Amino acid sequence: MNFNVIIDHTLLKPQATSQDIKILIEEAKKYNFGAICIAPIWVKLAKKELKNTNIKIVTVIGFPLGSQISAIKQKEASLAIAHGADEIDMVMNIGKFKEKDFQFIINEINQIKKEIGTKILKVIIETALLSPHEIADATKLVSSTNADFIKTSTGFSYRGASEQDLKIIKENKSEKLAIKAAGGITNLADMENFYRLGATRFGTSKSVSIIKNLTDKKNEY
């Protein structure tokens, strides 16, 4: 499996500068990562720097809490696409989910998908803040929307993706809904395990060390 192309090489630290983003982009070019994942403020810069490459630009909406007003999320998504984003990773409104206002969640996701058209939409459910039963319910809920992916985590909570998360999501998702594992993915073993459990995209800031490890592993044979 060529893991490089299914990695979203990620830099979402609030202290990231334009120079940090340029370094991220150069790494993505060097290691042939499928995408970079950055804050919306850097999308225009990335679009310029990634000209004439196949590397996709992923940005985050309603990040990292998910509690912004829906209209603000829609506008943020619309502007991100206008600036050159190829994919949107939005955070579900976790409070609304917790109080079982499921129609609110469905409407918000579908409104943002309508705003971005054919661009890819991933919905972050922040598994660290959900019980196993809630992860199952959230997966079914996202499956009922027009979202393209369900994503485990922002990377800003107390833990990221786990094996249990992936198993629950796989058991409860629709056939059309893809899985992005993110948060705390620091080594090749994690990535291989999550891939076996159904994840087809990975968000990590440790992409370079993971791929170097993969190369070293291949060279052992």
Swiss-Prot record:
GO terms for biological process: 2-deoxyribose 1-phosphate catabolic process; carbohydrate catabolic process; deoxyribonucleotide catabolic process. It comes from Mesomycoplasma hyopneumoniae (strain J / ATCC 25934 / NCTC 10110) (Mycoplasma hyopneumoniae). Its main location: cytoplasm. Its EC number is 4.1.2.4. The lineage of its organism: Bacteria, Bacillati, Mycoplasmatota, Mycoplasmoidales, Metamycoplasmataceae. The active site is at D89 (proton donor/acceptor), K151 (schiff-base intermediate with acetaldehyde), K180 (proton donor/acceptor). It holds the Pfam family DeoC. The keyword Cytoplasm applies. Keywords: Cytoplasm, Lyase, Schiff base. Belongs to the DeoC/FbaB aldolase family. DeoC type 1 subfamily. NCBIfam families: deoC. The keyword Cytoplasm applies. GO terms for cellular component: cytoplasm. InterPro entries: Aldolase_TIM, DeoC, DeoC/FbaB/LacD_aldolase, DeoC_typeI. This is Deoxyribose-phosphate aldolase. Pathway: Carbohydrate degradation; 2-deoxy-D-ribose 1-phosphate degradation; D-glyceraldehyde 3-phosphate and acetaldehyde from 2-deoxy-alpha-D-ribose 1-phosphate: step 2/2. Gene3D superfamilies: Aldolase class I. Catalyzes a reversible aldol reaction between acetaldehyde and D-glyceraldehyde 3-phosphate to generate 2-deoxy-D-ribose 5-phosphate. GO terms for molecular function: deoxyribose-phosphate aldolase activity. It catalyses: 2-deoxy-D-ribose 5-phosphate = D-glyceraldehyde 3-phosphate + acetaldehyde. It is found in: Cytoplasm. SMART domains: DeoC. It comes from the Bacteria.
